[in-house]
A protein has these predicted regions:
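Non-catalytic interaction-recognition regions
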Residues: 2-109, 120-585
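Short, charged, solvent-exposed linker or helix-capping segments at domain edges/interfaces
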Residues: 110-115
Length: 585
């Protein structure tokens, strides 16, 4: 059997639906059930295995159509169920008319064999042929990255991994905001700090709206170390241009270095400035004018009918302005009266580039939840320009609370400033950071326990799953030292694995490909970290209940296969999230 892209749970659910549908048709054909269209029905994994491996409400769903009691319908359906040659070996009718199906040992055997034989067990091809772009972090290159960027980096990279494992062609992208008001403010801040080095702070006060950080002073000093006072007497705009040209590439290199340390490798670093320099922003604005989505105001500004197009994607009562405040939604400026485009215009051009120019089937952006007001207007803009706004999906991410001794931590011990990504990675292992940030759904606020992240015991979830992997490696090494080897997957027979912990572990292993698909579909990599913890827990229960070294024959071979299967699943998950996979601890 070819185990590539094998999804045991999906196969069982699909076959159960087919068997039940065929049984209904057979019951109608012989008159046991009256002629009627079968309504939609559910096949699902019940919470309690006592209720079967697959349960269905098909009889209850058909009660109105067939004008019979659900239990009667269930008995008519099960009388026609053809289980010979299927994945199932028995059924039962339960309660008011549920039909419960029980999987046969061949299915359990196939799960173990697949998880051992396929080094990429869990990978599926549901997304084959579809190109997805995942843009995340995209921090302003004007200063250091904060905790939101730290969470967004781990979350975006984890989401991209889930999509990749579900078969999508994934591009990881960072959007460099190297144009517009932020860069103007960056240049002004740098230039004033440079002038202060020679004229003093009283002669050159730094306005409150400028960047106040020590990193700005450091960059100004670096510029002065090379150029001295050569720019003191020059035009201020010339100074700004020169000092930005010196500092901005260094900041971008710093972002790349810090994200690389965080084990994030992007496929594309896309510069906002390229959109302006290439004429892409102007082209998009012209296109919107042609469609009537934009119009020229009396002062010459080009206005976009934002509320009209955003309405279908949610309530847009307020929007965030460029200075960070909120105002009532209305027609928005895309090009100012002075001819300078707004950030929103560049953002529309950027997403048009993703979906129309580069042809991604989906563009997925990971944003902080404070940008929620921008979601509907951005999706609406895609409609306005002739694309489908549903091809743009936004993952909104809630804030991070750093905790120590049960109390919030807001300042770095080292710098006395707000904690940056670099500060975090200096304090906690990268493994912990990447795993912890992927333990909660993006829509939930995350409390990051700094004390827990450095603990080397089972309370630390990443240590817990790494230890399960290392324990398996130790078991296999001990078996090898005793001359006990695995004879290959063809000899594995799950029928001998009858202990409840063995059966539970196999069922859990079977869920891995389906969990990958669900995580990709729901943009929720936290499903996989939670699943990984469940697998580690199930393995520890199995290890404590079932002897491996002292077992014999087929039982021992089956248990060795279970060890190999669990090791492979944990290895694949940790590798997906770029967490180290130790063989000894």
């Amino acid at each position: 059997m070819d185990y590539k892209n094998y999804n045991p749970r999906a196969a069982a659910l699909a076959q159960a639906r087919t068997l039940l549908t065929d049984a209904v048709k057979a019951a109608i054909a012989d008159g046991t059930l009256p002629e009627a269209a079968l309504p939609d029905f559910i096949v699902e994994i019940p919470a309690d295995v006592k209720n079967g491996d697959i349960a269905s409400n098909v009889a209850m769903a058909g009660a109105r159509a067939f004008h019979k009691a659900p239990r009667q319908i269930a008995e008519a359906i099960t009388a026609k169920l053809q289980l010979d040659g299927s994945l199932f070996d028995r059924f039962e009718v339960a309660g008011p008319g549920f039909i419960n199906l029980f999987l046969g040992q061949d299915w359990f055997t196939s799960v173990v064999r697949a998880a051992v034989a396929n080094p990429e067990y869990g990978r599926t091809d549901v997304g084959a042929g579809k190109k997805y772009n995942v843009e995340f972090v995209s921090a302003n290159p004007t200063g250091p990255m904060h905790m939101g960027n730290a969470r967004g980096g781990a979350l975006g990279d984890g989401l991209a991994a889930c999509l990749d494992w579900a078969g999508y062609d994934v591009t990881r992208e960072f959007y460099i905001n190297d144009a517009g008001n932020q860069i103007e403010k960056f240049g002004k801040s740098l230039a004033i700090r440079y002038l202060q080095l020679y004229k003093g702070e009283d002669a050159c006060p730094l306005p409150e709206e400028c960047y106040q950080g020590a990193d700005i002073i450091a960059r100004a000093k670096e510029f002065a170390a090379v150029h001295g006072d050569a720019y003191v007497g020059k035009d201020f705009d010339e100074l700004k241009k020169a000092i930005v040209a010196d500092a901005l590439p260094k900041n971008i290199e710093g972002l790349q270095r810090d994200l690389g340390k965080y084990r994030i490798q992007y496929d594309v670093w896309f510069h906002e400035s390229d959109l302006h320099n290439s004429g892409a922003v102007k082209a998009v604005v012209d296109k919107l004018l042609e469609t009537g989505a934009c119009y020229k105001a009396e002062d010459g500004a080009i206005m976009y009918r934002s509320a009209q197009y955003a309405a279908k994607y949610g309530v847009v009562n307020k929007r965030k302005t460029e200075d960070g405040s909120e105002e009532e939604a209305k027609d928005e400026v895309l090009v100012r009266a002075n001819g300078i485009p707004t950030y929103f215009a560049a953002d529309i051009a950027y997403h048009y580039n993703k979906l129309a120019v580069r042809g991604f089937d989906k563009a997925i952006d990971v944003w902080g939840a404070d940008h929620h007001g921008h979601v509907a207007r951005m999706k609406g803009a895609m409609d306005a320009i002739g694309l489908d706004g549903s091809r743009l999906d936004i993952v909104l991410m809630q804030m991070v609370n750093l905790m120590r001794d049960g109390k919030p931590v807001r300042m770095s011990k080292r710098t006395g400033k707000a904690i940056t990504l670099t500060d975090l990675l200096d304090e906690v292992p990268i493994d912990s950071a990447r795993f912890f940030f992927n333990q909660r759904e993006s829509s939930s606020t995350l409390d990051f326990d700094l004390d827990l992240a450095v603990r080397n015991d089972s309370e630390n979830p990443v240590y817990y799953v790494q230890y399960a992997h290392a324990r398996i490696c130790s078991v296999l090494k001990k078996l090898e030292s005793e001359g006990i080897t695995f004879n290959g997957v063809d000899g594995v027979d799950a029928a001998v694995l009858t202990d409840p912990t063995e059966q539970a572990l196999i069922r859990l292993l079977a869920a891995f490909p389906a969990e990958i698909v669900a995580a990709a579909d729901k943009y929720d990599p936290a499903r996989i970290t939670r699943y990984c913890i469940d697998v580690a827990s199930a393995y520890h229960r199995f290890y404590n209940a079932c002897r491996i070294m002292d077992a014999e024959g087929a039982v021992q071979q089956g248990r060795i296969a279970l060890c190999l299967a669990v090791r492979g699943v944990i290895r694949n998950i940790l590798t997906m999230f770029k967490v180290s996979v130790p063989e000894t601890m």
